[in-house]
Amino acid sequence: MNNLKRVVVIGSGFAGLSAACVLAKEGYKVTVLEKNSQPGGRASVWETDGFKFDMGPSWYWMPDVFENFFALFGKKPSDYYNLKRLDPGYRIYYGKDDLMDVPAAMALMEEMFESIEPGSSAHLREFLAQAEYKYKVGMGEYVFRPSHSITEFIDWNLIKKSFSMQLLTSLRKHVRQHFKNPKLVKLLEFPVLFLGATPQNTPAMYSMMNYADLALGTWYPMGGMNEIVKAMVKLAEELGVTINLDTEVTKIEVENNKVSNIITDKETLQADFVIAGADYQHVDQKLLDEPYRNYTDKYWDSRTMSPSSLLFFVGINKKLNSIEHHNLFFDEDFEQHAKEIYTNPQWPSKPLFYVACTSKTDDTVAPAEGENIFFLIPLAPGLNDDDATREQYFDMVINRFEHITGESIKDNIVVKRSYAMNDFKADYHSFKGNAYGLANTLAQTAFFKPAMRNKHIKNLLYTGQLTVPGPGVPPALISGQIAAKEAIKMLS
């Protein structure tokens, strides 16, 4: 019966591929439409002159989410790619000759905390025990709810557990109740950068990210993050999914409150159901006529977006000894940078930045005597983006990188590419050029997020980082599963 039912998935990011796989396993005929020339959405890859760069996500956290996804199909991540746990997980530079390596082993982590703030190892155990509880409740009972309405959360067992989730306490306050040393505070507040809000505006529930970071660890799929995309594409094709690349959806036509036609720049398709994994705002405002939109322009403009980013992909013809795979440069004032992202949006005066050098772990991503370096500066979304400004910031981060690490790279650059707001918009129709979707503030959590269901169209659902559960690769995998299960219910 299901073989007769056709589902079109718009977008081949993690959420779209996840939804496609779940639907295909249930016997639906699934076609994925992808506007770009490679699948994976933001997790695309750029290869040039022997260098290979992941252009989007670079952190592999929450390995259990990937294991659980592949287990739905009787598979394991190791059937498709080789995972390596990084040790140290990452390095933080607080200034010149002032760094912290974050160890994989918990005993060494406790030793490090104790050496920085005497007595803090006991606080760390207590803090991580609370974070583990939040992670297990959040990832087990909250995250798979489609959040159509508050009634899904009116469950006495869940309400009792919610009191321990610290929804109304800020992460900033929660961290400072346990730790005083500024270095430890920065270490524990850093993961919320992935959630797109400041620690004072992020619920303490999200200390679950500290459990993901410090206890579950930082991993790397050999070959790069795009290996996950390749794995999901292979799985999808094994399940019978058709993926059409270089195919952009230009219009969704509706008749009798159902999608009648999906018009692309190549052809017109019909489907029994549509799951939109492309940028939600773009689908809502650009692909649908006004009567069928979930939201107004005013609504979208009032959303708090997570940051965008200015990225630089740099290949050099020398080896580096004094950096790790993941490196965070916290040598400037976090508060000032946060204000310039969230309070008074502007190009930052002295930004924090992040550097990935995957060739430290993986010799397949750069020539033998070279390194591939990825620089990321978090920015307010919607800023004016031009080449002159990009160059100014490139010079700034290269100078600071060289000063702090003691490594000279300026004269060894053989490959360079920048990527920022205009590129996010052009490649992904990204609203305001955002990189990470909606900020995970309390007012944009669960049923306060843009709805997964279209209110006016019976056979259209949304998935991805602008709806539930939120930004990040593991949440996108989960979002696709939720959308697929909802679609199956609605099609039954």
Task: Please state what every model-predicted region is.
Residues 3-136:
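N-terminal glycine-rich phosphate/pyrophosphate-binding loop and immediately adjacent elements
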Residues 57, 467-487:
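A conserved FAD-binding loop/helix module that cradles the flavin
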Residues 95-201:
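Rossmann-like flavin
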Residues 181-195, 350-354, 407-469:
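A glycine-rich dinucleotide-binding beta-alpha-beta segment and adjacent secondary-structure elements
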Residues 208-259:
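Helical element adjacent to the flavin cofactor pocket in flavoenzyme catalytic cores
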Residues 250-366:
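Mid-domain catalytic core of redox enzymes
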Residues 254, 489-492:
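Active-site-proximal substrate-binding core of FAD-dependent oxidoreductases
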Residues 317-422:
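C-terminal segments that line or cap access tunnels to active or ligand-binding sites in enzymes
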